[in-house]
């Protein structure tokens, strides 16, 4: 028998009658509590509020929050865990319109990624499940989730008008063997806001590969690869427009503020603003724009098929390690134009002698 509770029915008829409720009553049912994925799958469509209570997701299964009724609220309660299997995931998938996803005080989502970590991430070794697919989660909110130790990528975002606020993604236990644990990957999306994220990971804190009207603000990023646009190029959608990344800290990471585009590809990066970004302990580049990525690696030879225009770097300040490079700009011929460069100060590392085609006003 599927287990779920309805506050509208159980309050007067008792839990024993819930499973036997006629179909007509299912449409009016309000608050439902689920303790298993099977009960969630069969009962979610009838609920306006869903509480997920200490769910242990079986190995190789997705916690399926897709196709929810418009206006549904989902509440994580207790500890959510996942069985072990080598597969691509996702561990959680959500879709719908005007959905709210949040958690009760003290709740957490524990992926126990150490079971998969082998230092190779998505590049070999064990096949690792991605964490959260937020595809077609439109006009919705994800608030206050506490997420620990994703096996590989965190939130995959492909939605419109989605706000993610005050989310913790803590992969600090993966410092040695965690890899490709990107926190927020954004693609083919519009009007995305990520506000107040706290991230400890081993890859990009934010990566915007395509999309428009995207805001990342009040973030704290520790241990990963920094705040990134790209890599842009070579995908079905190669347009990034109107992205603001502001009031954020990047600590003990490879890069601070980064734009990277693919060698030989076409596309555009326009209207991107990095504003009030604080850097500390950066180990590779404080500010970096590279147009030379091929097969995921830099070639040192930039191309100009992806236009990088109307870019603002304003008050990106802080320190890099002595072996790092303060600023590195490697643009294709004529492809980096109309930049605003103001109040930036990155110190502690080396000055690059390999910058090319630096746009007017910027310094390298």
UniProtKB/Swiss-Prot annotation:
Keywords associated with the record: Cell wall biogenesis/degradation, Disulfide bond, Glycoprotein, Glycosidase, Hydrolase, Repeat, Secreted, Signal, Zymogen
PbH1 repeat ranges per the UniProt record: 159-188, 189-210, 211-231, 240-261, 269-291, 303-324
Active site residues per record: 203 (proton donor), 225
Residues of this chain annotated as glycosylated in UniProt: 138, 141, 338
Pfam families registered for this protein in UniProt: Glyco_hydro_28
Highest taxon above the source species: Eukaryota
Signal peptide: 1-20
Gene3D superfamilies found in the cross-reference section: Single-stranded right-handed beta-helix, Pectin lyase-like
Example of a GO cellular component annotation carried by this entry: extracellular region
Primary localization class, coarse: secreted
PROSITE patterns from the UniProt entry: POLYGALACTURONASE
Role: Involved in maceration and soft-rotting of plant tissue. Hydrolyzes the 1,4-alpha glycosidic bonds of de-esterified pectate in the smooth region of the plant cell wall.
Family per similarity comment: Belongs to the glycosyl hydrolase 28 family.
Listed name of the protein: Probable endopolygalacturonase B
Taxonomic placement: Eukaryota, Fungi, Dikarya, Ascomycota, Pezizomycotina
């Amino acid at each position: 028998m599927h287990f779920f509770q309805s506050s509208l029915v159980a309050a007067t008829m008792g839990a024993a009658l819930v499973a036997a409720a006629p179909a007509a009553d299912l449409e009016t049912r309000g608050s439902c509590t689920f303790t298993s994925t099977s009960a969630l799958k069969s009962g979610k469509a009838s609920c306006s509020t869903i509480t997920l209570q200490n769910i242990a997701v079986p190995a190789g299964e997705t916690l399926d929050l897709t196709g929810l009724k418009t206006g549904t609220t989902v509440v994580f309660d207790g500890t959510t865990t996942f069985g072990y299997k080598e597969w691509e995931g996702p561990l959680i998938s959500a879709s719908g319109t005007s959905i709210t996803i949040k958690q009760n005080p003290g709740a957490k989502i524990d992926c126990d990624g150490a079971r998969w970590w082998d230092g190779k991430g998505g590049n070999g070794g064990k096949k690792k499940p991605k964490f959260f697919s937020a595809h077609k989660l439109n006009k919705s909110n994800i608030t206050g989730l506490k997420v620990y130790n994703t096996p590989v990528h965190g939130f995959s975002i492909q939605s419109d008008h989605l706000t993610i606020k005050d989310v913790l993604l803590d992969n600090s236990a993966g410092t040695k063997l965690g890899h490709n644990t990107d926190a927020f990957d954004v693609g083919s999306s519009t009007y995305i806001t990520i506000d107040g994220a706290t991230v400890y990971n081993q890859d990009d804190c934010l990566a915007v590969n395509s999309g428009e009207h995207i805001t990342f603000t009040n973030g704290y990023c520790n241990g990963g690869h920094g705040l990134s646009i790209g890599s842009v190029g070579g995908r079905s959608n190669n347009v990034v427009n109107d992205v603001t990344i502001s009031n954020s800290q990047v600590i003990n990471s490879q890069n601070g503020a980064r734009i990277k585009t693919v060698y030989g590809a076409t596309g555009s990066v326009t209207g991107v603003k990095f504003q009030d970004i604080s850097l500390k302990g950066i180990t590779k580049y404080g500010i970096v724009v590279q147009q030379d990525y091929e097969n995921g690696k830099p070639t040192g030879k930039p191309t100009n098929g992806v236009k990088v225009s109307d870019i603002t770097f304003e008050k990106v300040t802080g320190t890099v390690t002595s072996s790092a490079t303060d600023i590195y700009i490697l643009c294709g011929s004529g492809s980096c134009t109309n930049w605003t460069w103001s109040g930036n100060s990155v110190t502690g590392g080396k000055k690059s002698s390999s910058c090319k085609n630096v746009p007017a006003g910027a310094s390298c």
